[in-house]
UniProtKB/Swiss-Prot annotation:
It comes from the Bacteria. Removes 5-oxoproline from various penultimate amino acid residues except L-proline. Disulfide bonds: none annotated. It is found in: Cytoplasm. HAMAP family: Pyrrolid_peptidase (MF_00417). This is Pyrrolidone-carboxylate peptidase. It catalyses: Release of an N-terminal pyroglutamyl group from a polypeptide, the second amino acid generally not being Pro. GO terms for molecular function: pyroglutamyl-peptidase activity. The keyword Cytoplasm applies. SUPFAM superfamilies: Pyrrolidone carboxyl peptidase (pyroglutamate aminopeptidase). The active site is at residues 80, 143, 166. It comes from Citrobacter koseri (strain ATCC BAA-895 / CDC 4225-83 / SGSC4696). The lineage of its organism: Bacteria, Pseudomonadati, Pseudomonadota, Gammaproteobacteria, Enterobacterales. Keywords: Cytoplasm, Hydrolase, Protease, Thiol protease. Homotetramer.
Amino acid sequence: MKTVLITGFEPFGGEQVNPSWEVVSRLDNAIIAGCRVVARQLPCVFGDSLTVLNAAIDALSPVLVLAIGQAGGRTDITVERVAINIDDARIPDNRGRQPVDEPIVAEGPAAWFSTLPIKAMVSAMREAGIPASVSQTAGTFVCNHVMYGLLHKLRDIQDVKGGFIHIPYLPEQAAAHPGAPSMAAETVRQALEIAIVTALHVETDIAVTGGATH
């Protein structure tokens, strides 16, 4: 049976939970679209996160890798379009590291684009009644670090799709951040199942607008 690798992060930035791991862990050992889903937690640490991710890819030989992260303040499930080759941390990671304007891969390309059918994934989520959109930036913290590192690793591995999805706060987190949007864990789980099915089945992305004016 083919394998799908899906990752989430440990809590960071003073939060007690990270919605990415809270939801991703629920998918561990699930069978979706004929594939076994394996969930792995990544440390919210520059460098170490990619060490754990790369080891999992090497051990599992997945056909699809989805990295999931928290984006507090976003209202939608946001499927990332691109990762850039820069670490520029507004806050320290979980080991106190705070790189500023450092490349993720020395002499690497400026950016890597997701190899997922990002617009088809967003469309399928919306059809299921789940708020979703394409995101034009994964930030410059550990999420972008992981997305760039993932796509850089997959560049020489044939027939493996990969990319990154940001998810909102859970309601219990938003309660501590008055006015912040949130999404229930079960809704996010449904969205990630849709993302997996769509990514596995759609080879050519749909041609619909997903851009932004700013």
